[in-house]
Amino acid sequence: MSYPQGYLYQPPGSLALYSCPAYGASALAAPRSEELARSSSGSAFSPYPGSAAFTAQAATGFSSPLQYSSDPAGFPSYMGSPYDAHTTGMTGALSYHPYGSAAYPYQLNDPAYRKNATRDATATLKAWLQEHRKNPYPTKGEKIMLAIITKMTLTQVSTWFANARRRLKKENKMTWAPRNKSEDEDDDEGDGERVKEEQSEKAQDCNETSAEDEGISLHVDSLTDHSCSADSDGEKLPCRATDHLCESGSESKEKYDDDEDEEEGDEEDRVLPVKPATSSPLTGVEAPILNHQQDGSPRNSNKTSLDNGMSPSSQTPASKPKLWSLAEIATSDHKHSNLGSVLSSATSSAAHNPSYPSSSLLGRHIYYTSPFYSNYTNYGNFNALQSQGILRYSSAAVTANEGLNQTVLSTSSMHKHTSDSVRTASNQLDQHYRPTNFESKKDPSEVCTVGVQPYP
């Protein structure tokens, strides 16, 4: 490798690292002056016979791969002096093209290499094409021969023939029969046409397979939907068969309508049973599973309170039916403000909320003290009726019914007793599903003091 004219070449002796001592125990023990004197003849990384590293290796018995009898010259014999480029040696190095190599026959600056086809080259190709008008498909050997004659590459020759055939097709001068490309021929046009045809066929196949896959996926989705629906129905059936505790608001309403049609015939013979509140008509969220096995005594005591403690609203004319509306519940607090002394023991836990009187416990339906109702109104929860957010009928209903019995005894002279308890209970169930905005302004005197409201 040669260097340019103005390049300052430094011999290996001047590139020695004077600050880096040679490696080895003897080198460390050697005098500093001798090391500096010997370092001028060799580098620390390629030790020569005069360096300290070479003497250390020789002392330990290792032979150096660079065994010179004397100091080597700055340049080998085949290289000339860098400062005299025109002397003997590599005189032609400066004129050699740096991008050329022996493996590439046509150099970039070689006049034999033709970048663009000239008229002479195309004239040769046209002459061959004119002779082979009936079969303008040159073989591999013919292409190589034409490439050598025209000094073009095989790619250029193949491209020129493909363009010539395409041009003749457009000019309707096609004098040959189209044929398939043989194995030993390199036809660009045939390749392009076949690639296009194969791509179109593959696209059609992909469309068909995608349609089939979509059909299969749709079939699988439908099967999974049916199976999921069947599983969900199977899960819902035992809940519906055993009890009403897993029904939502709309389902319980529809089931209540069906049950009401069946029970209309024998309403006069038996008393309509009171069902626990299982879901909220406002939210549609499933209510928590209640401890309904311990509801026997509250329900039995509630029947007597229903017989004796019905409000005048159920006995008034039909122009003002009873309605459990939010406005009526709000006004019920003022009606029962005089019952605070009687119910002080039952509502002692609600005394922490000063905004609501202590007598509002019985003025409000027990169902509306559920955890779901406080999310949609401004009424707070009652800790006496809730234990960790779950409505407990086993303890709350008993306390409420005890207060109800006292209220009924104290106010029995003010109300008219009724013997038709079935009719009043059914009226309450029918009026329970009326819209809440119906008769928003209700007389405060028309308030029912019933404990557990029957709700399907």
Curated annotation (Swiss-Prot):
GO MF entries: DNA binding; DNA-binding transcription factor activity, RNA polymerase II-specific
Localization terms from the record: Nucleus
SMART domains, sorted: HOX, IRO
InterPro entries to which the protein is assigned, alphabetical: HD, Homeobox_CS, Homeodomain-like_sf, Iroquois_homeo, KN_HD
Principal subcellular localization: nucleus
Keywords, in A-Z order: Developmental protein, Differentiation, DNA-binding, Homeobox, Neurogenesis, Nucleus, Transcription, Transcription regulation
Disulfide bridge partners, by residue number: none
Ranges of biased composition (kind: Acidic residues): 257-269
Biased composition (Polar residues): 291-318
Residue stretches of biased makeup (Basic and acidic residues): 192-205, 246-256
Region of interest (Disordered), ranges: 172-214, 246-320, 434-456
DNA-binding region(s) from the entry: 110-172
Tissue: Expressed in the neural plate in overlapping patterns with other irx members, which all share an anterior border of expression. Also expressed in the placodes. Broadly expressed in the tailbud rhombencephalon (hindbrain). Outside the nervous system and at tailbud stages, expressed in the developing otic vesicle, branchial arches, prospective heart region and pronephros.
One GO-annotated biological process of the protein: brain development
A GO cellular-component term linked to this record: nucleus
Entry's family note: Belongs to the TALE/IRO homeobox family.
PANTHER family reported for this sequence: IROQUOIS-CLASS HOMEODOMAIN PROTEIN IRX, IROQUOIS-CLASS HOMEODOMAIN PROTEIN IRX-2
Functional summary from the UniProt entry: Acts partially redundantly with other irx members in neural patterning. Required for formation of the posterior forebrain, midbrain, hindbrain, and to a lesser extent, spinal cord. Acts early in neural plate development to induce expression of some but not all proneural genes, and specify a neural precursor state. Also up-regulates repressors that prevent neuronal differentiation. Patterns the neuroectoderm in both the anterior/posterior and dorsal/ventral axes. Probably dispensable for pronephric kidney development.
Protein's recorded name: Iroquois-class homeodomain protein irx-2
UniProt organism field: Xenopus tropicalis
